[in-house]
A protein has these predicted regions:
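Single conserved hydrophobic/aromatic residue that forms the stacking wall/gate
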Residues: 364-372
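Residue-level signal for inorganic ion chemistry
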Residues: 30, 178, 268, 305, ...
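Conserved AMP-binding/adenylate-forming
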Residues: 216-313
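Nucleotide 5′-phosphate-binding alpha/beta core
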Residues: 1-88, 94-111, 115-119, 230, ...
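Adenylate-forming
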Residues: 301, 320-350
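AMP-binding/adenylate-forming
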Residues: 103-118, 127-187
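A short linear hydrophobic-aromatic micro-motif
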Residues: 236, 357-363
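Conserved helix-loop-beta element of the AMP-binding
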Residues: 127-129, 195-218
Length: 372
């Protein structure tokens, strides 16, 4: 993996040329080491030397979650002795998939989060309170710790849950930044209010949020984001988008206008149901090609997540592609009386009802031919 943190500030044309050079290296690596992609290239008569531009990726079939589940071990590109870490996906849309990482992959993971924290305006002068698990085969928790260490931040590894312990840590260590699932911030606020803690004057000034959307496609705060911001206006909220499969993340800058691509680490496409690129302004399925991964690199992997892309330059100075919060997962699309919607739209409504603390959404298919 090549570290080039300045590439995100280059022109879109320079970024594209840089990524195409890394793509050539990735294809050669897959041809040499991946049993799954060796078979794919053979079956589809793909000459990787002819794949020179990002647009040429359309000549290659996509990789799906089903491929990963059915052929998990065939994606591994390294000897077992070179594997340092084992993790699994969340299994949101099916059986969890095992991913393996080498020592260099862990370095890449650390660099990813270094870039992510940097994008969110963190520095070595910050102290991070890690409010996510670092165990249970969860890649991200370890990534956050490694990235904070690379940036030079101090870290308090509190883990998830236990509001009392979280507030005790805030009072003892005075962290300036939190890494957290945003809905847990509601629980921290409720605990503070019940225990006469003035959360608006505490040391915590920003949170990098994972796992749940905070914004609408127009960049305004959604219901969850509004609830947090109204109760804790002094806290800045930064959204991220990531997955185990991509081993990297998209993170908002201080403009809060979408998560920035990290060009050294992945190539992203936005595809329709026919695996063709959608136009800017149309929602598409996030499809990624990893760059610089040794253990289990992926080529044109369809994440199942539907997002918008933004290509205009950002006021922060970065010229990378940005993406919106997740509109929904392709496998969870609902058609109701001719209208298409995704579960997050329901979540946003339920999050706006104060008396609703927890909920489960159940979907049933009507026995009649029409949807209901």
């Amino acid at each position: 993996m090549e570290k080039n943190p300045d590439i995100q500030f280059r022109s879109p044309e320079e970024i594209k040329l840089y990524q195409e050079a890394r793509l050539t290296e990735t294809l050669a690596y897959l041809q040499a080491h991946s049993r799954f992609y060796q078979q794919m290239f053979k079956e589809h008569s793909i000459d990787i030397t002819r794949i020179k531009k990002i647009e040429d990726l359309q000549q290659i079939p996509v990789t799906t979650k089903t491929d990963l589940q059915l052929h998990n071990s065939e994606f591994i590109c390294v000897d077992p002795d070179d594997i340092i870490d084992y993790v699994t996906t969340s299994g949101t849309l099916g059986d969890p998939v095992t991913f393996v990482l080498t020592s260099k992959d862990l370095d890449r993971l650390a660099y990813n989060e270094y870039l992510s924290f940097n994008t969110a305006g963190c520095s070595r002068h910050d102290i991070l309170q890690l409010m996510t698990t670092i165990d249970r085969r969860f890649m991200a928790g370890l990534a956050y710790y490694l990235g904070a260490r690379e940036l030079g931040m101090g870290v308090a590894r509190v883990g998830n849950g236990i509001p009392e312990l979280q507030w005790d840590t805030i009072h003892r260590i005075h962290p300036t930044c939190g890494m957290v699932v945003p809905s847990f911030l509601i629980k921290l606020i409720e605990f503070a209010e019940k225990n006469q803690i003035d959360h608006n004057t505490c040391s915590m000034k920003k949170c990098v949020c994972i796992g749940e959307a905070l914004r609408n496609p127009d960049f305004t705060l959604n219901t969850l984001g509004q609830r947090i911001s109204e109760k804790w206006p002094s806290l800045q909220l930064y959204s991220t988008y990531a997955s185990t499969e991509m081993q990297s993340s998209f993170t908002e800058c201080s403009e809060f206008h979408g998560g920035h691509l990290q060009p050294e680490l992945i190539i992203v496409e936005f595809l329709d149901d026919k695996n063709l690129p959608v136009k800017v302004g149309e929602p598409g399925e996030v499809t990624i090609t990893t760059l610089g991964v040794e253990g289990m690199p992926l080529l044109r992997f369809k994440t199942g997540d539907i997002c918008y892309q933004y290509t205009e330059p950002c006021a922060c100075g970065r010229n990378t592609i940005r993406l919106s919060s997740v509109l929904g997962r392709k496998g969870q699309m609902i058609k109701y009386k001719g209208t298409t919607l995704y579960p997050p739209a329901l979540f946003d409504i339920l999050d706006d009802i104060p008396r609703v603390k927890n909920y489960v959404c159940l979907l049933y298919t009507s026995p009649s031919p029409r949807d209901a």
